[in-house]
């Protein structure tokens, strides 16, 4: 069941991973069976009339087909699943998802990575927020505050490091209060471990960006991040000089360099299990 929860800033959507995948398929025009259970679900909520989505849902789905990976990771919580992580940079937001094995991949997991231009993300958020239900209420939340978009546009690394977990915590508080303990715990974990979600740029599962040369500039270290987020448990996992990097075009990436990717995933999972 897709649930929508009102907040002061808008609506937070909650759906299962299956429903999230079905919505992506439907948005991409791959789900054409009018008798499909997910179409029935949408029909039952008044979002499909006959065999066609109502106009505002059509616009929503069209936007989702372009930006759903980012939007779903941020505002559509696959409750209880550690499958999606995201990070943001001066010019883009990126979502990575392990197709098997949970949020943190090992060498056997397939990792999918999507990126969206932050200006497009901003326009999509505000555009979708303006698309009204018949009652005139917005369809998607406006819970991502202006200050975060400002940080993105200005390439302000310090603001990004503060605002990403702040937004996640705000969402976690809403879900923890309004939804259920399991989902609230999921988002609280996302908030507290948000800097781990600032993951490496993925070419394949075990390939990291080349840290040599002038194409990268350090904007923070792991110690800086731990201090900002007060996640002291993670400080012991990495040396203080592990860099967070921005490339010559201002693209923001984080880099973690343990002895091996396998050690990283094992360490993180151990901390999360405590």
Sequence positions of predicted segments:
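Short, surface-exposed polybasic-aromatic patches that bind anionic ligands, especially phosphate groups
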Residues: 1-274
């Amino acid at each position: 069941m897709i649930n929508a929860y009102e907040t002061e800033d808008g609506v937070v959507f909650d759906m299962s991973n299956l429903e999230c995948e079905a919505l992506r398929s439907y948005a991409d025009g791959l789900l054409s069976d009018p008798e499909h259970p997910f179409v029935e679900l949408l029909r039952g909520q008044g979002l499909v009339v006959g065999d066609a989505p109502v106009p505002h849902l059509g616009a929503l789905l069209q936007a989702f087909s372009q930006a759903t990976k980012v939007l779903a990771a941020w505002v559509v919580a696959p409750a209880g699943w550690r499958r999606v992580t995201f990070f943001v940079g001066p010019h883009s937001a990126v979502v990575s998802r392990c197709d098997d094995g949970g949020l943190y991949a090992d060498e056997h997991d397939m990792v999918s990575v999507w990126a969206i231009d932050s200006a497009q993300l901003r326009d999509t958020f505000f555009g979708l927020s303006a698309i009204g239900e018949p009652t005139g209420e917005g369809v998607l939340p406006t819970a991502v505050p202006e200050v975060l978009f400002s940080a993105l546009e200005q390439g302000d690394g310090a603001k990004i490091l503060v605002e990403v977990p702040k937004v996640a915590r705000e969402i976690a508080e809403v879900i923890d209060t309004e939804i259920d303990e399991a989902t609230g715990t999921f988002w609280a974990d996302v908030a507290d471990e948000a800097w781990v979600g600032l993951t490496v740029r993925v070419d394949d599962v075990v390939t990291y960006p080349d840290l040599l040369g002038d194409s990268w500039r350090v904007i923070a270290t792991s110690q800086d991040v731990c201090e900002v987020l007060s996640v002291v448990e993670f400080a012991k996992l990495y040396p203080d000089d592990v860099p967070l990097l921005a490339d010559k075009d201002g693209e923001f990436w984080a880099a973690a360099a343990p002895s091996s990717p396998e050690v990283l995933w094992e360490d993180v999972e151990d901390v999360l299990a405590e």
